Every structure is written in structure tokens, then in C-alpha cells.
């Protein structure tokens, strides 16, 4: 089971291990959690078949679909009940930044070049506001949503791109986060966390994984693990048309989905 390093990799693997065990018990086989140092490392693993299936953000799903002919098995249902979530741009509450347009000349932390909420959709919002990412701002990739928040709270950057439930997710790590930051922009709906199967995983096992996940969502204790980590409360059939919005946004961001490495 491949997952992208959206937060501390070691902790992510540890937190997901009980979920992997529960899934393995349903499947009658051992399920191991795998992550890499970058989002693309997980996508490449799914493409090569060294990772059998992944629970990945939507942009990673589209990349693996395009580059490795993977199959979307299920999409996560967010805590809002929608089959997706929103990117948001955060600044410190004591900041005089009130809108995306105010970010001109500022320092921004994105998460990863392959992060939908942590870069691609937020970057598109900046472009829509007339901001040239290469000329009008200074930016860096932090490597994780938690790392971006730390940079913001430390005043190393003026703004960060993340997702709508990030404050709730990191309340333990940053107890005063809700009081310290504010949202200045919100994206259109992004397709949810997606279960993708490697092209090398046989169809019978794909069906078993899908069925096991649909059953496991009724186990409150086990699905709570995914709620805590990814803000999803269960799974549903993916609407593959919804992923076309990612292709349009990628085009706006000058990202060639066939060439991302």
C-alpha cells in the first residue's frame, strides 16, 4: 500500500500500520505500508509494480493513470460528505495580507510539485490573480503540510498552500493553530484521495482490495485512522470525469502530465 509523504514519513507509516493490518486480515494476506521521499517516488513505485496499490492525492492518481495505465478503484469521501476537498491559502492572523493579490512580493511555502492542494490548485489561484510564480513571489517546497505550517508559524514564509482540514489535522502538533492563522483563498472542489491499482496487479486482487475497503469503511475504529490522516470517512465509486479538472489546472500551470518525473 503506497502513500505519499504528505507529512512526517515515519509517523505516517506507523499510523497507517493498524489500518494495513485490518485490510490484510480482510484480504487474507499481509499488507505493508510504503512511502518515499517524494510524491513522485510513490507514483513510480505503483507504475513499476513494486507498489501494488496506492491511497494517493488526486494529482498523483492522474499522473499514474497517464504514465502507467493504473486504474482508479475508489475515491475517498471527505468529512464534509463530498467526494473531494478544497485547497486553501493560509497566512498568519496578524498579517496584513487579505487576498491572493496581496501575495505579490511575498514568500510562500508549497508542499510538493505533485501536491494538488499544496501546489497545483493554489498556484493556479495565484496565476488567476495575475501573479507570476517565477517573478512575483519567492517560493519553496517544504516536503509536507506540517512542515509548511511550521515555516508559517516561524515567520519564515508569509503564506502556505494546504487543504481545508489541515488545522484540525495538526491541532496536536500546533495547539494554537486555529488562533494563529487565517484563510485568504479557497479553490474549486478537488477530487478526493484516490485508491489506484497498479497495472501489474491482477484483476481478481483489484476486486478483492476494492471490496475489502468498502467493507472496512463500516468499521468505525479502522476508518477513523483514515479520517485522522486524510480527512476521509469512507469510499465511493470514482467519477473519472471529475479528474478532468486536474488536467485543465495542470495545463494552466504548464505541467505536462506525461513528462512529470
State what each model feature region is:
Residues 40-54, 67-68, 101, 145-165:
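Short helices/loops that flank or line small-molecule/ion binding pockets
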Residues 95, 106-204:
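Pocket-lining segment of extracytoplasmic ligand-binding domains
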Amino acid at each position: 500500500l503506497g502513500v505519499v509523504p504528505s507529512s512526517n514519513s515515519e509517523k505516517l507509516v506507523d499510523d497507517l500500520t493498524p489500518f494495513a493490518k485490518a485490510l490484510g486480515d480482510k484480504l487474507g494476506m499481509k499488507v505493508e505500508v510504503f512511502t518515499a521521499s517524494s510524491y513522485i517516488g510513490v507514483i513510480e513505485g505503483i507504475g513499476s509494480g513494486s507498489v501494488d496499490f496506492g491511497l494517493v492525492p488526486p494529482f498523483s492518481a492522474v499522473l499514474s493513470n497517464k504514465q502507467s495505465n493504473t486504474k482508479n478503484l475508489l475515491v475517498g469521501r471527505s468529512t464534509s460528505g463530498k467526494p473531494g476537498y478544497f485547497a486553501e491559502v493560509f497566512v498568519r492572523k496578524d498579517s496584513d495580507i487579505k487576498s491572493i493579490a496581496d501575495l505579490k512580493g511575498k514568500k510562500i511555502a508549497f508542499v510538493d510539485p505533485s501536491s494538488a492542494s499544496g501546489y497545483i490548485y493554489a498556484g493556479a489561484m495565484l496565476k488567476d490573480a495575475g501573479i507570476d510564480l517565477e517573478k512575483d513571489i519567492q517560493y519553496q517546497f517544504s516536503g509536507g503540510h506540517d512542515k509548511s505550517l511550521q515555516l508559517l508559524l516561524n515567520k519564515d514564509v508569509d503564506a502556505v498552500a494546504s487543504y481545508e482540514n489541515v488545522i484540525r489535522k495538526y491541532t496536536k502538533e500546533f495547539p494554537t493553530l486555529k488562533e494563529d492563522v487565517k484563510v485568504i483563498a479557497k479553490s474549486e472542489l478537488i477530487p478526493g484521495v484516490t485508491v489506484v491499482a497498479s497495472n501489474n496487479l491482477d484483476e481478481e486482487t483489484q476486486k478483492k482490495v476494492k471490496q475489502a475497503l468498502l467493507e472496512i469503511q463500516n468499521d468505525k475504529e479502522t476508518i477513523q485512522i483514515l479520517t485522522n490522516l486524510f480527512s476521509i470517512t469512507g469510499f465511493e465509486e470514482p467519477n473519472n470525469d471529475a479528474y478532468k479538472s486536474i488536467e485543465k489546472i495542470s495545463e494552466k500551470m504548464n505541467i505536462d502530465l506525461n513528462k512529470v518525473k
